[in-house]
A protein has these predicted regions:
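Short glycine-rich or small-residue beta-strand-to-loop segments that form or flank ligand, phosphate
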Residues: 11-15, 62-66, 125-130, 264-269, ...
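Conformationally flexible catalytic loops at phosphate/diphosphate-handling active centers
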Residues: 153-256
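Structural beta-sheet core signal
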Residues: 50, 64, 90-91, 155, ...
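Short, glycine-/Ser/Thr-/acidic-enriched flexible segments
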Residues: 69-70, 95-96, 131-133, 160-162, ...
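Short acidic, glycine/serine/threonine-rich loops at helix termini
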Residues: 24-27, 51-54, 74-78, 99-106, ...
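Conserved thiamine diphosphate
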Residues: 105-159, 179-185
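Thiamine diphosphate
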Residues: 1-116, 118-120, 123, 159, ...
C-alpha cells in the first residue's frame, strides 16, 4: 500500500494508529520526508481525514489509513469529501467487530459500511485486493480514480492481506499510468467557478489558498461553492455527484474470472478469502469467480448472473451478496 501510494504521487498522510493498519502510517512516517511529503499523526481519526481533505484542496495527493472503529469515526468527513468533491484515498484494513471486536483477527464485515456508511444519497468507489501485488496496483488505481472523478476512494483490505508477506514486482516509473491533478487554466483576476464541470464532466481544481478565492462546504452549493437550498441547484448537484461515478461504472468496475466456461455453480469472493475459495473450487473441479473490485458502482452486469447457482462469501450476513446480486 505504501509503495503504491508513493508511486502514485502521495505527498501527505494524516492518521491515527489502529490495528491492523498501523504499519501503513509507520512506514510512511519514514518514507514521505524523503520525497518532500508530510506525515502528521493526528489526535484521532476524525481530524485525520479532515486534515487529508485540507491537504488535498491545497494541492497535494493525500490519504489516511484506519480500521473498523476508526473508519466509523471518519464517516462524516468522508461525506464532506464526497460533497466537496475532494480527491483523496482512505485505506481501511478490516478487523473483527463491532466495537473493539477482534483487533488482531481477520474479518470482512465492513462492506456495507464502505458502501453506505455516509448518510444521504451518494455514490462511492471501493477497491479490494487479494495479494500484495494487487494491493500495490489497487492503491495506484485508487489515487488515479480519486483524481479522475474528484472523489474519495476507499481501499478495503483485510487483516490477512494487510499483514501478508509476498514478493512485489515493482514497476518502473512511468510503467503504470499515474493520473495527475487536473488544474484549472483560469488565470488570476478572471471569474473562476470551482464547481462548474467541463463538457466532459471533469472538474478542474485550483489549489486552495492560491490565486483564486472560493468556498468549500459540506452544504449543497452552487457553482461558486456557496450554500444554497434552491431546489433546481440542489437536484442538479445531487445527480452530478452520483452520475459522475455510476455513469462510468463500466469503466470503473472490474473482476477476475476463473473456469467460468459451462459453469453451473460460481463462487464469488474478495480479499484474502478469494484465494482460499479459488483453491478449493479448483481442487474440486468446480468453476469460480471472485471480485477484486466490489461494492460500488452497482450498475454493472455481474459476471455470475447467467449461472444457476451463485455462492457468495465471506460473512454470515451476506453483505457482499446484497451488493452483487
Amino acid at each position: 500500500c505504501v509503495r503504491g501510494a508513493l508511486y502514485a504521487g502521495l505527498r501527505f498522510f494524516a492518521g491515527y494508529p489502529i490495528t491492523p493498519s498501523t504499519e501503513v502510517a509507520e512506514l510512511l512516517s519514514e518514507e514521505l520526508p524523503h520525497v518532500g511529503g508530510r506525515f502528521i499523526q493526528m489526535e484521532d481519526e476524525i481530524s485525520s481525514l479532515c486534515a487529508v481533505c485540507a491537504a488535498s484542496v491545497a494541492g497535494d495527493k493525500a490519504m489516511t489509513a484506519t480500521s473498523g472503529p476508526g473508519f466509523s469515526l471518519m464517516q462524516e468527513a468522508l461525506g464532506y469529501a464526497i460533497m466537496g468533491e475532494i480527491p483523496c484515498v482512505v485505506t481501511s484494513v478490516q478487523r473483527g467487530g463491532p466495537s473493539t471486536g477482534l483487533p488482531t483477527k481477520v474479518a470482512q464485515g465492513d462492506v456495507n459500511q464502505a458502501r453506505w456508511g455516509v448518510h444521504g444519497d451518494h455514490a462511492i468507489i471501493v477497491l479490494t485486493a487479494s495479494s500484495v501485488q494487487d494491493v500495490f496496483a489497487m492503491t495506484v488505481e485508487g489515487f488515479n480514480m480519486a483524481e479522475t472523478y474528484r472523489t474519495p476512494v476507499i481501499l478495503l483490505f483485510d487483516e490477512v492481506v494487510g499483514h501478508m508477506r509476498e514478493r512485489l514486482d515493482m514497476p518502473e516509473p512511468g510503467e503504470l499510468p499515474v493520473v495527475e491533478r487536473l488544474r484549472t487554466s483560469v488565470k488570476a483576476g478572471v471569474n473562476y467557478y470551482p464547481y462548474l464541470p467541463r463538457e466532459d464532466g471533469r472538474l478542474p481544481m485550483s489549489d486552495f489558498g492560491g490565486v483564486h478565492r472560493y468556498n468549500v462546504t459540506g452544504l449543497y452549493h452552487d457553482i461558486w461553492g456557496f450554500p444554497t437550498e434552491q431546489p433546481e441547484t440542489v437536484n442538479k448537484l445531487l445527480y452530478h455527484l452520483v452520475d459522475k461515478i455510476e455513469a462510468k461504472a463500466a469503466e470503473i468496475a472490474r473482476w477476475k474470472e476463473y473456469f467460468l466456461d459451462d459453469a453451473q455453480q460460481v463462487f464469488v469472493s474478495y480479499g484474502s478469502a478469494a484465494r482460499s475459495a479459488l483453491h478449493l473450487v479448483h481442487t474440486h473441479g468446480c468453476s469460480a469467480a471472485f471480485a477484486r473490485f466490489v461494492v460500488e458502482p452497482r450498475d454493472v452486469p455481474c459476471p455470475v448472473s447467467e449461472h444457476r447457482e451463485c455462492f457468495l462469501g465471506k460473512g454470515r450476513y451476506h453483505q457482499l451478496a446484497l451488493l452483487t446480486l
